[in-house]
């Protein structure tokens, strides 16, 4: 009796920088030696979209080339569509988001469309990882690290069903240190809004730059990246402040 051929690995890629962004294209190219790669990503830059879904208009999906789909929607829309419609009869083994054009450290994860795309994969039951390059130069380095993570997962599955957030320093591969497991750091409040006038004299506002690092000590993702190490942070979706439950219960019962 003949052995059944092993099912090839299948990976869904998404991002928040857009379907034609350098990061996702470099990652796809690196992973195609390992797996069938399907890209489902926004038609334009949707950075900062977080976990938003498009609810009041339809999603327009265009196949721009083989196994590459452009979606007029958010990163979360993209993964939701891919897993609940496009690939529902043959789900991917992994959902990877990125490579993001810039860091997703500390509080950034609450706003990040890159992390949100991976989180949607996690919600829908697929092991998911977000990758971000702390810069905009060495995408090949980040793609190589991502491939190594996938290869290690194939050899020995990731020992947690948590969503993983991985940041890679913007350095040549040979200058990178090892990978370290970290916790999220934190930033100060974002800087003030920037007010300007449009050509017609109307006031317009831009969001100010993100705040500087506040909690960036040893063990945080900020510190690890600063030291030239790759940072990997397991994230959980449960936002319950469990240590506060008893105190809140007592407060409510006090007369």
UniProtKB/Swiss-Prot annotation:
EC numbers: 3.1.3.5
Please give the GO cellular component terms listed in this UniProt entry: cytoplasm
Q: Which keywords does this chain's UniProt record carry?
A: Cytoplasm, Hydrolase, Metal-binding, Nucleotide-binding
- Cofactors that this protein relies on: a divalent metal cation
What GO molecular function annotations does the UniProt record carry, in alphabetical order?
3'-nucleotidase activity; 5'-nucleotidase activity; exopolyphosphatase activity; metal ion binding; nucleotide binding
Record field: catalytic activity: a ribonucleoside 5'-phosphate + H2O = a ribonucleoside + phosphate
Q: Which Gene3D superfamilies does the UniProt entry name for this protein?
A: Survival protein SurE-like phosphatase/nucleotidase (3.40.1210.10)
Q: Which residues are involved in binding a divalent metal cation?
A: 16-17, 47, 100
Task: Give the subcellular location.
Answer: Cytoplasm
Kindly state what the record says about how the cofactor is bound: Binds 1 divalent metal cation per subunit.
The free-text function statement in the UniProt record for this protein reads:
Nucleotidase that shows phosphatase activity on nucleoside 5'-monophosphates.
The entry assigns this protein to a family as follows: Belongs to the SurE nucleotidase family.
Entry's HAMAP family? Answer: SurE (MF_00060)
Against NCBIfam families, the record matches this protein to:
PRK00346.1-3 (NF001489), PRK00346.1-4 (NF001490), PRK00346.2-2 (NF001492), surE (TIGR00087)
Task: Name the chain's protein.
Answer: 5'-nucleotidase SurE
């Amino acid at each position: 009796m003949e052995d059944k051929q092993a099912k090839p690995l299948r990976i869904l890629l998404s991002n928040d920088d857009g379907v034609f962004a350098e990061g996702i294209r470099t990652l796809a190219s690196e992973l195609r030696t390992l797996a069938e790669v399907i890209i489902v990503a926004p038609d334009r830059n949707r950075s900062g979209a977080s976990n938003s879904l498009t609810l009041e208009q339809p999603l327009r999906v265009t196949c721009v080339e083989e196994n590459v789909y452009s979606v007029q929607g958010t990163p979360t829309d993209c993964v939701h569509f891919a897993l609940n419609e496009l690939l529902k009869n043959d789900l991917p083994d992994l959902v990877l988001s990125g490579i993001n054009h810039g860091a997703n450290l500390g509080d950034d994860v609450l706003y990040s469309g890159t992390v949100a795309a991976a989180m949607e994969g996690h919600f829908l039951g697929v092991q998911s990882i977000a990758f971000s390059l702390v810069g905009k130069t060495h995408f090949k380095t980040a793609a190589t690290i991502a491939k190594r993570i996938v290869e290690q997962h194939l050899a020995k599955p990731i020992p947690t069903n948590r969503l993983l957030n991985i940041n890679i320093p913007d350095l040549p591969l040979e200058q990178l240190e090892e990978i370290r497991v970290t916790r999220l750091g934190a930033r100060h409040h974002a800087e003030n809004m920037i007010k300007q006038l449009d050509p017609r004299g109307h006031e317009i506002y831009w969001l100010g730059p993100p705040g500087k690092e506040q909690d960036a000590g040893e063990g945080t993702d900020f510190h690890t990246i600063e030291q030239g190490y790759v940072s990997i942070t397991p994230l959980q979706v449960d936002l319950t402040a469990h240590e506060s439950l008893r105190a809140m219960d007592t407060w409510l019962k006090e007369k």
